[in-house]
């Protein structure tokens, strides 16, 4: 079988081509296109544009550049010392006032209440609580204030021997019997 190459001609069933128009006729149809936009360099040649259109001269005289016209300082601004009013110094608190302020701290009271209830504190809270208690203890030592409970406890522990403890136990039992007899 012989081979036949494909052609671009469609044959009888193909769409019909438009009749060919001569070059002279095409030039008349298109004509010169209308210009759109400004001419090149129009932004920089403002003087030429104003010379060509004198009626616009009075109406518009503005800078063709876009953006802010505000001047910008290129050097660092010099620092001027302000004669600010000095801060009013508050009188220093006495040790007693510091102690009262520490003891009335709501966060301290809240954390102490949490400890009494048996809750665990976070590490940050525990650390803060220890610092506050140390401050309070230092102020109390400085002022000569001491906890009465702490003073009694060491005195008892020194004098306590086995015999003393047994005597106290028996006297407690006797007091209990006396109390029960009354009621």
Swiss-Prot record:
InterPro entries per record: YihI
Gene Ontology MF terms: GTPase activator activity
Family the entry assigns: Belongs to the YihI family.
Superkingdom of source: Bacteria
Quaternary structure, from the entry: Interacts with Der.
Annotated GO biological process: ribosome biogenesis
Annotated organism of origin: Shewanella oneidensis (strain ATCC 700550 / JCM 31522 / CIP 106686 / LMG 19005 / NCIMB 14063 / MR-1)
UniProt cross-references to Pfam families, sorted A to Z: YihI (PF04220)
Known role: A GTPase-activating protein (GAP) that modifies Der/EngA GTPase function. May play a role in ribosome biogenesis.
Composition skew (Basic and acidic residues), residue ranges: 22-46, 92-101
Segments of this protein annotated with the region Disordered: 1-101
Chain segments annotated as coiled-coil in the UniProt record: none
Record keywords, A-Z: GTPase activation, Ribosome biogenesis
Protein name: Der GTPase-activating protein YihI
């Amino acid at each position: 079988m012989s081979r036949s190459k494909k052609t671009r001609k469609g044959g009888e069933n193909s769409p019909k081509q438009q009749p060919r128009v001569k070059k002279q006729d095409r030039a008349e149809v298109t004509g010169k296109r209308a210009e759109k936009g400004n001419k090149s360099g129009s932004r920089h040649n403002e003087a030429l544009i104003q010379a060509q259109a004198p009626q616009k001269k009075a109406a518009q005289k503005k800078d063709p550049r876009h953006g802010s016209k505000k001047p910008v300082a290129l050097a660092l601004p010099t620092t001027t010392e302000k004669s600010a009013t000095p801060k009013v110094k508050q009188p220093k608190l006495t040790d007693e006032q510091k102690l009262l302020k520490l003891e009335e701290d709501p966060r301290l009271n809240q954390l102490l209440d949490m400890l009494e209830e048996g809750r665990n504190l976070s590490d940050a809270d525990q650390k803060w609580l220890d610092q506050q208690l140390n401050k309070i203890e230092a102020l109390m030592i400085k002022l000569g204030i001491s906890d009465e409970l702490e003073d009694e406890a060491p005195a008892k522990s020194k004098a306590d021997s086995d015999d003393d403890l047994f005597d106290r136990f028996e006297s407690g039992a006797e007091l209990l019997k006396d109390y029960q007899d009354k009621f």
